[in-house]
Amino acid sequence: MGILGIIVEYNPFHNGHLYHLQTSKELTKCDYTIAVMSGNFVQRGEPAIVDKWKRTQMALKAGIDLVIELPVVYATSTAENFAYGAVKLLDSLKIVDCISFGSEKGDLNELTKIAEILLEEPIYYRKALKEYLKSGITFAKARELALQKVINNNEIEKILQTSNNILAIEYLKSLKKIGSSITPFTIKRKGSLYTSLELKGEFASASSIRKHIFEKGLEGLEKYIPDFTKEILQSSFEKKQGPVSLEEFSNILIYLLRNHIPLNHIFDVSEGLENKIYKASYKTNNVEELMKLVKSKRYTESRIRHILIHLLLNIDKQIFKEFDGPNYIRVLGFNEKGKEMLREIKKKSPLPIITKVSQYKEKLSNTKMFEKDLFATDIYTLAYKNSSIAGLDFIHPLIKL
């Protein structure tokens, strides 16, 4: 039985995701599928539109057999940390044969070549990088030019400017870094770019679907999302459990910033940026507006988003030094095939499986990372329009299909 691993967010699940899942199963000829999925906060540096249990329902209805949560410290980090945490978790299961991910390039050889150079940093690459950095350009641009020089490929700029290619390269780097035996596959992305905000083409991006939901609701999305996604979203919204956006947390974030809560413990914060964020918090009450005030050529919106989410969730950069990947397997949901795989994982994986959250202290010698997930849920539910209690992780049942 071949087992396929995929790394997902399903924010929300749409027809492009369905295409990737079905094509991946056909390409790899795997009979079983495991998804490592971001929880209530996602890699863009924002809350998911609906919670992790609703998105687990979508995944299982689409044909995923087992859904495992990617710890929030990795789910909300840089592409490099996100990929490393997710790949390390899949590898730690000790049953996964293949991994499949989307990319705009769709060419594994080209992406692998780039991944190997970035991981190994051969002397000729380091020399070229140093030369370009001396000219005063940003690190990202210097890296791009250095790669272009050593690989002699004019498409490098195009490859490194699209988010799925960047993640694909990071997945390949992580597989190589940990010496994983998992075989990688890539599916060429179809339809709109990941960042596109327009509903168009055969497959719309998750960003454009979320934008439509916030502005116009669910009507008009039938062409882009499966019926089950629409039903799950509709049910959530009727219960006033979403749609959730970063703006819901504006007051908390502005309070923390005006109170000058230190930012220097957060990943990717420099002194100049810290002061700029503090100053901007006195000019607006809205977090989206704050990001526009801080954003510049030097400080990207993505970087600012991640800093704000880590401030909101109190994620310290030290945690990445304390852990080498996730130290537990948090199960969110499964079907009968997923139950079979859990039995195999229990036999083979060195990591504890957590299905009953109340037992986490007995199962984990270091609870710090897991408790960040619990805290993230408690913060996330503050955005619900109904009265929501804390501790949802302890009382929400596993999703079973």
From Swiss-Prot:
Sections of the chain in a coiled coil: none
Query: Where is this protein found?
Result: Cytoplasm
Q: Does the keyword Membrane apply?
A: no
Report the EC number(s), separated by commas if there are several: 6.3.4.-
Which reaction equation describes what this protein catalyses?
A: cytidine(34) in elongator tRNA(Met) + acetate + ATP = N(4)-acetylcytidine(34) in elongator tRNA(Met) + AMP + diphosphate
**Alphabetical list of SUPFAM superfamilies matching this protein:** Nucleotidylyl transferase (SSF52374)
Stated name of the protein = tRNA(Met) cytidine acetate ligase
Q: Which organism is it from?
A: Thermoanaerobacter sp. (strain X514)
Gene name linked to the record: tmcAL
